[in-house]
Curated annotation (Swiss-Prot):
The keyword Ligase applies. InterPro entries: Anticodon_Met (IPR041872), Met-tRNA_ligase_1 (IPR023458), Met-tRNA_synth (IPR014758), Methionyl/Leucyl_tRNA_Synth (IPR015413), MetRS_core (IPR033911), MetRS_Zn (IPR029038), Rossmann-like_a/b/a_fold (IPR014729), tRNAsynth_Ia_anticodon-bd (IPR009080). It comes from the Bacteria. This is Methionine--tRNA ligase. One of its GO terms (molecular function) is methionine-tRNA ligase activity. The keyword ATP-binding applies. GO terms for cellular component: aminoacyl-tRNA synthetase multienzyme complex; cytosol. ATP binds at T349. Its EC number is 6.1.1.10. It comes from Cereibacter sphaeroides (strain ATCC 17029 / ATH 2.4.9).
Amino acid sequence: MARILITSAIPYINGIKHLGNLVGSQLPADLYARYMRGRGHEVMFICATDEHGTPAELAAAKAGKPVEDYCAEMHEVQKEIAAGFRLSFDHFGRSSSARNHRLTQHFAGALAENGFIEEVVERQFFSVADNRFLPDRYIEGTCPNCGYDKARGDQCENCTKQLDPTDLIDPRSAISGSTELELRETKHLYLRQRALKDEIEAWIDSKTDWPVLTTSIAKKWLHDGEGLQDRGITRDLKWGVPVRKGSEPWPGMEGKVFYVWFDAPIEYIAGTAEWADANGKTDADWERWWRTDRGAEDVRYVQFMGKDNVPFHTLSFPATIMGSREPWKLVDYIKSFNYLNYDGGQFSTSQGRGVFMDQALSILPADYWRWWLLSHAPENSDSEFTWENFQSSVNKDLADVLGNLVSRVTKFCRSKFGETVPAGGSPGEREHQLVAELQQRLAAYEACMEAMEVRKAASELRALWVAGNEYLQSAAPWTVVKTDPEQAQAMIRLALNLIRLYAVISRPFIPDAAASMMTSLGCEDWSWPADVGRALEVLPAGHGFTTPEVLFRKITDEERAEWQTRFSGVRS
């Protein structure tokens, strides 16, 4: 049994996330966590809300609420929606937790002690209208790289280029919109990433199995232009982790907080500590996942994120870990994703464009969305959500293939043999061929899941469903029963066991449907099918079942057209 630590990029607190956020981090992370648990491994799956920085302050101000209250409310909203999508976090934490405050301050102190923090006097925009310094995300303007007119002072969300506020063309305050900005002096802490460049580069070079998307972005940031730069890790904000050197005050840094991108990844560790606190466990219980001197040396750590988060996870967070000179666990594998677009444009939380997670669940249950998003995950390139494709995929894959098999088998058995697994007959050559095909396809499915090739895994799972349907079409028990009822019973006995097999292996993708299939079969045996032949004998003759309701209903053309109009791309 392996020990797998899984973290998903933590979503910003500023509103409900869209489907692009979901498929770029949390959902594939959940798929992998569910699969690894299903294979019997020990899994720790951590996520949280990212509650500090400009987005939280601006969103709270817009909502007319104190930022602490806003974050507490939105954490519960995001937690509830995550549960609605059946995201199986072991803990869904908060970056504003006391644990994260202490750990962030601890890392800053360790970095300073080791000479990797520099105090820098810099010139920063001061808004005369707002009477305050403006951190980078409080400044908007036109991106000098791509011309996008809503670029932020830290990064352009359109082209992902990292920016300095002074790079922006026609900068303005994100608070008031005022262009009356002055450059004034202020002092901040910088993480000396350049001093750690050789260590970081050697570490990245050692990760020969990483996706091309991950390594290409990391190496681009390492080498393009002037290469890896030192990074400011403090801001002139009120809301955040107060700047301290470990447990001690930091002279000259009074009233400042740590930059959100410094404290947010540390929440992966803090969130695991929060899990221990919430479950009455000790520090040793979470440290065995994170400290290589306390049991984490055999842990495999996998991160999931969108491509815009890759630089922070391949450069800045590793620099924090390495520079601490403490035995913390570094990530082993980073699975990154491209963007999911919406009807010819980009999803965007800040711009309110696209279908959002709460809206999606108000239309259809989670499994419909999970299946489409995972089977169309933007792994090798950007992908696009269209209502036509969504309807086609749901109707063909879920309703016509899997749902149809479950319905035909259970209803036929009920009508001919009652709601018990029939006892007659024995497997023939056709059944043996099916078992061999399923064994081969299952191995391919497992290989894709192990490699985190999400779209290929979905394709292999669908092929497993198709194999069962093709067997039924070929065997035709509804015809055989007229001349050889014993053989028809053997076919249906195998087919009922096939439903259980599909429930077990489909659970990572469609957990609710899997649970429904198992409930109908009156079975609680979720053991992974190492041997398909034996797996197709788990339900014995005489075992009772109930004929389920429709597993997946089809989406009508009228519904598709109505949703297309209703969700035209802008959230009110």
